[in-house]
Regions:
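Solvent-exposed, polar/charged alpha-helical surfaces in well-ordered, non-transmembrane soluble domains
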Residues: 37, 41, 58, 62, ...
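Loop/turn elements at helix/coil->beta-strand transitions in domains of secreted/extracellular proteins
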Residues: 14, 44-46, 72-77, 196-203, ...
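Membrane/wall-proximal cationic-aromatic binding patches
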Residues: 1-45, 150-170, 244-263
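Histidine-centered active-site loop/cap adjacent to the catalytic His
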Residues: 260-285
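Active-site flanking residues adjacent to catalytic metal/cofactor-binding acidic residues
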Residues: 20, 79-81, 238
């Protein structure tokens, strides 16, 4: 979970570091076509991408703390908070007072979350990344017909549901929406404190899944929570909801989905990543 330009990969000093889950990692496109890769190329800033599949706030906190203790330096950390972070953070992970993350119920699952992301993810989990990327690419060669509604897996639908559910406790979630969000905010508060101690700037970004475009509102609870968190903390709060909602309102949900997302998947395609990069570059000067 550490990507950068080849000539920079052994360096421990970066202008910008990005962290998030598979959306930030860039699954399944190449680094150069991801919003982080485009940002690095266009701005010339030394940039590290720390994102990897299934990361969430507890891991953002643990991983950044680990890297700083190992002597890595960033001027500015940008966290891309994903819609699925709520489910992953509350259902999968526990964190102790030493900021060590473990997987909940790992004995029952018989997978120990890929030996917990290769023993707490120093800089790897490469094999799972390659396998997942190959499988993802092979599943997305066909283009979505303009009148064809996307079909998502039940797990994807479940992870998206919390932002537009009328219920505080959703079946399949370990915690209620209010309690779960408070736990995520608490982790991010701790991350902010660690960054502040080293004079590292923090910015935060939010963006919609296709589910939010179809079922949620532009001023989603996901937006409200992190906009409120960012007051007096973040250098920038980067809200991508208006871009995609405006596009949808000027065309249609299906047209917007087809243009920016992969078929039957909530991840952004190359066009979507270009949109993320464009706004990012406009804000981060």
């Amino acid at each position: 979970g550490f990507k950068s330009k080849c000539k920079q990969i052994d360096d421990k000093n970066y202008n910008f570091a990005f962290i998030g889950d598979s959306f930030t990692e860039g699954t399944p496109i190449e680094y150069e076509d991801s919003f982080v890769g485009i940002f690095a190329e266009k701005t010339g800033y030394k940039t590290a991408n720390l994102g990897i599949v299934s990361y969430s706030p507890k891991i953002y906190l643990s991983k950044v703390n680990y890297l700083l203790q190992e002597g890595f330096k960033f001027d500015h950390l940008i966290v891309f908070i994903d819609i699925s972070d709520f489910y992953d953070d509350t259902n999968f992970y526990s964190i102790d007072q030493n900021l060590k993350v473990t997987e909940k119920y790992s004995e029952k699952k018989n997978l120990k979350r890929r030996k917990f992301l290769r023993n707490n993810f120093p800089l790897t989990n490469f094999y799972m990344f390659v396998l997942k990327k190959y499988k993802f690419r092979s599943n997305h060669k066909k283009k979505l017909n303009i009148n064809e509604s996307p079909i998502f897996t039940d797990k994807v639908n479940l992870k998206a549901k919390w932002t537009y559910s009328n219920e505080n406790k959703i079946e399949g979630y370990d915690l209620g929406i209010r309690e779960g969000n408070q736990i995520m905010v608490d982790q991010m508060e701790k991350l902010y404190e660690i960054l502040s101690q080293q004079s590292i700037k923090l910015s935060l970004a939010v963006y919609p899944w296709p589910h939010q475009l179809e079922n949620d509102v532009i001023n989603s609870i996901h937006v409200k929570i992190w906009q409120e968190f960012c007051k007096n903390k973040c250098e920038n709060f980067i809200n991508y909801f208006p871009i995609f909602f405006d596009e949808m309102n000027n065309s249609s949900y299906l047209e917007t989905y087809k243009k920016y997302y992969f078929k039957n998947d909530p991840h952004f395609n190359k066009v979507g990543h270009k949109v993320l990069a464009k706004k990012l570059i406009e804000i981060i000067k």
